[in-house]
């Protein structure tokens, strides 16, 4: 059953009953998909919500990321090291803070740390490596991008978040991306924080589910149309899709994002499971999460290999179990098991904080964990070649 609500909703199920509560709907459509098998159900779902977009071939390879690479010099050094070790890497992914210091969300490279972004990306391309960049829907109020949105009244009231529900907002956002970022030859986008309001992150202790939901409803309804709040991620993806298809029709869209809605698959989105914490229990849960996501009709799903958080931090979500990081053989084993699982996912990406994520962080050449990582990455070449053919 597919429901058309874009509002915040609460679903509860137990042995005795199941119920759905939505907060604000002008109307509510129910679609019953009664295909003879799961494949037919997925076909029916996509007939209603749109066909999944095809990614470029490189996006099925190995994507190396880190929280965070800090400079053009570091990125090129990482590319050189992969090449020196003869380990294939298809994409390097630059996390937040590409912008000038203090200008969160500004769609401009920091000229001190990235003096020649076009040259950097051209150098990567010559090595056969693509480049992905993190961009955000919010902009600090001191930035030129924010001021342009504010002048045109295309921000949600009282926030630094652009209004993706308005066509004018989507057009202006892409205009800024194209003028100052896409012009350098960027291959893919990491549309981070596409919720984009997350009150649960403000807690030191994990809030109860009901409390987290109530806070989300309260905070989002105060600034967004209540009947659309859950679909912001999809409208944000529409911004990137329509903009790139118009400006660079020869390039397939790649959009790594954290939130979406029914139909996001038609905008070239890859959903990843967010900032998870390192434990065997979490790895087990990721297997279930990936299967459930795929069953929802979405095509591309991935995760942070080894989990985003490795150590124990102050906040409730910074809850990794390996305070010694890569120095702990137990974490290195968990990391490799995660990588072995991820090698069979639609998208294969290493990312996280607390520890380095390049293969050589696992040990010296010839050691067990290093060789295991090398086998996973090189084996992915054969896996994704077949996967690409099937999906094409």
Model-derived regions: residue spans:
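Catalytic-domain carbohydrate-binding cleft regions of carbohydrate-active enzymes
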Residues: 1-392
């Amino acid at each position: 059953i597919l429901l058309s609500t874009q509002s915040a909703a609460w679903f509860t199920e137990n042995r005795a009953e199941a119920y759905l509560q939505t907060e604000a709907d002008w109307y509510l459509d129910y679609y019953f998909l009664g295909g003879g098998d799961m494949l037919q159900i997925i076909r029916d779902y996509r007939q209603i919500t749109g066909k999944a977009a095809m990614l470029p071939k490189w996006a099925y390879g190995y994507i190396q990321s880190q929280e965070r690479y800090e400079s053009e010099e570091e990125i090129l050094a990482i590319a050189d090291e992969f090449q020196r070790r003869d380990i294939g890497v298809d994409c390097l992914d630059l996390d937040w803070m590409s912008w000038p210091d203090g200008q969160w969300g500004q769609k401009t490279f920091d000229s001190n740390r990235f003096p020649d972004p076009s040259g950097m990306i051209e150098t990567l391309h010559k090595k056969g490596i693509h480049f992905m960049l993190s961009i955000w829907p919010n902009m600090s109020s001191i930035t030129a991008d924010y001021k342009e949105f504010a002048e045109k009244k295309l921000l949600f009231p009282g926030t630094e978040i652009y209004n993706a529900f308005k066509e004018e907002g989507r057009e202006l956002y892409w205009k800024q991306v194209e003028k100052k970022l896409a012009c350098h030859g960027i291959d893919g986008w990491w549309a981070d924080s596409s919720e984009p309001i997350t009150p649960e992150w403000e807690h030191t202790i994990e809030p109860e589910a009901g409390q987290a939901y109530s806070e989300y409803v309260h905070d989002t309804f105060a600034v967004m149309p209540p009947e659309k709040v859950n679909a912001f991620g999809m409208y944000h993806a529409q911004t990137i899709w329509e903009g790139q298809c118009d400006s660079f029709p020869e390039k397939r869209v790649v959009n790594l994002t954290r939130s979406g809605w029914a139909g996001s698959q038609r905008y070239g989105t890859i959903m990843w499971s967010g900032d998870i914490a390192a434990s065997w229990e979490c790895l087990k849960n990721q297997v279930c999460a990936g299967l459930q996501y795929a069953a929802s009709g979405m095509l591309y799903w991935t995760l942070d290999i080894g989990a985003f958080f490795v150590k124990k931090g102050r906040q409730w979500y910074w809850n990794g179990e390996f305070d010694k990081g890569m120095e702990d053989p137990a974490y290195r084993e968990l990391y490799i098991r995660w990588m072995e699982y991820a090698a069979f996912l639609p998208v294969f990406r290493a990312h996280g904080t607390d520890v380095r994520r390049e293969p050589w962080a696992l040990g010296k050449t010839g050691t067990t964990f290093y060789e295991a990582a090398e086998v996973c990455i090189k084996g992915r070449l054969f896996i994704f070649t077949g996967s690409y053919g099937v999906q094409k």
